[in-house]
């Protein structure tokens, strides 16, 4: 008997703001996991405010300012949860404050910005980065492909 492929996104909201877009984010991130051929994989998405993400940025990256998204990938690629065969990728922290301000700054919806940040964080968990022009081209290309194929356009 074939075992069922289960990918999970676990949400945790550390802010007072209700995040109406959780279901959409779960769908787009599950779509991204499927696109990357991941099986039995999970990770956490944690919504925070600018103060919280500022502290994370300062304490773990020595950068004394807020940012939009920070990821903490588990170093062991074969990390398992509770003895199961489920692989835990790590945590994605998203600043809702920053997502709102960037959506306004870039002239698109909060839904689009939050989706972009979630997918961006997902690719960081997979080891992608954008420190060089070439890395950025690859990572941002993958992100945009997921968002476009899923149906999240820039003007959403």
Regions inferred by a protein language model and the residue ranges of each:
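An acidic/histidine-cluster motif and surrounding catalytic segment
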Residues: 1-112, 123-156
């Amino acid at each position: 008997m074939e075992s069922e492929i289960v990918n999970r996104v676990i949400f945790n909201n550390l802010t007072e703001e209700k995040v109406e877009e959780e279901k959409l984010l779960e769908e787009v991130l599950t779509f991204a996991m499927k696109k990357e051929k991941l099986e039995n994989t999970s990770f956490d998405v944690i919504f925070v405010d600018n103060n919280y993400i500022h502290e994370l940025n300062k304490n773990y990256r020595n950068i004394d300012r807020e940012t939009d998204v920070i990821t903490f990938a588990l170093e062991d690629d074969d990390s398992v949860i509770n003895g199961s065969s489920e692989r835990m990728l790590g945590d994605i922290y998203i600043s809702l404050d920053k997502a709102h301000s960037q959506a306004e700054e870039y002239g698109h919806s909060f839904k689009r910005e939050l989706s972009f940040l979630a997918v961006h964080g997902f690719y960081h968990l997979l080891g992608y980065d954008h420190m060089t022009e070439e890395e950025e081209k690859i990572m941002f290309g993958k992100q945009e492909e997921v968002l476009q194929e899923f149906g999240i356009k820039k003007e959403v």
